[in-house]
Amino acid sequence: MSIFLYIFIVFAFVISNVFQLFNSISIETQIMTSTFFIMLVGIPHGSLDHLLLPTQNFKSKLKFYISYLGLILLNLLVWNFSHIIGLVLFILISSYHFGESQLYKFNLKNKLITHFTYLCWGASVVFSFFFYNIEELVFLSNSFEDTRELLSNINLDLFSYLFFTSNIITLMLFAFFIYKFKIKANKIISELFFLFVIHLSSFLFPLLICFTLFFIILHSLPSLVNQYNHFKKVNNKFTLKDFIYLMAPYSLVSIMLLLFISFCSFTNIINYSVPLISIILISVITLPHSFIISKFNESLAL
């Protein structure tokens, strides 16, 4: 069991005791707590994208920034054209990104099966959040007109279908890996336990809490450790303090920009609710970030 999964279980145990003590946690408290930890850990894990790939000269750096900003602009155009298409694209990219971040070390030597596995594994996680908390998803969406309208265009039964389909396919793929690629059974069992813990937390906890636990502890923290080890490998004098100092300015700028846009939404300067504009902002950043992390993880798997 990885140290991150152990941390996850410990935090889940603490939160379950908090629920028993107070019977429930208000949605306002959940939102504030989730937002705080996402800003503390989630945003920093993507703040150094521009430093993770080799950019030796001005031309390569310029190409990187044009590509990065171009993907953001393209995604914004998609959301402006259709919120449904933007949401579907966001779920697909997030699913692939989560799966790739977890399973990149499998190194299956078959790109098609590898990419398909990343997508299915990530989808099994994403739809577990929705499947076990569908009533809360509807409640949160109904709190704002634009999110209510967005969800009204989706057949909620589809979440159940995608939940079962993605999980069944993932299990079949794991069995196939043992047979075809000779992946050790104990490694597959470890991944199955990992998924079981995610499903259990999604079943036990509200949507915001189970997602935040996963995103912070099982996704962002491992990524931060990989990034730190990367910089440490390049410079053996690189310290944790250096890493924090390196992340801090980019993270603070990102947080301030997000707060500013949220303020504009709250004061109706931007004609989107805070939840919807938050989803859009996370979506447009996730697209280029997933490309960078994919390339970065490829270098780690070599």
Regions found by a protein language model. Give the residues of each.
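Alpha-helical transmembrane segments of multi-pass integral membrane proteins
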Residues: L92, F116-L137, F159-F177, F193-L207, ...
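Membrane-interface helix-loop-helix junctions at boundaries between adjacent transmembrane segments
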Residues: T55-L62, I66, L73-S152
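Short, hydrophobic transmembrane alpha-helix segments
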Residues: S16-T29, S265-I269
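N-terminal membrane topogenic signal
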Residues: M1-F11, F58-L62, I244
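Hydrophobic, membrane-inserted alpha-helices
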Residues: A12-N17, S67-L76, F98, L192-S201
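Alpha-helical transmembrane segments and their membrane-interface exit regions
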Residues: F37-G46, I91-L103, I216-Q227, S283-P288
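Membrane-water interface signatures at transmembrane helix termini and the short loops
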Residues: N186-N226
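C-terminal ends of transmembrane helices
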Residues: P44-T55, Y96-L108, M172-K184, Q227-Y228, ...
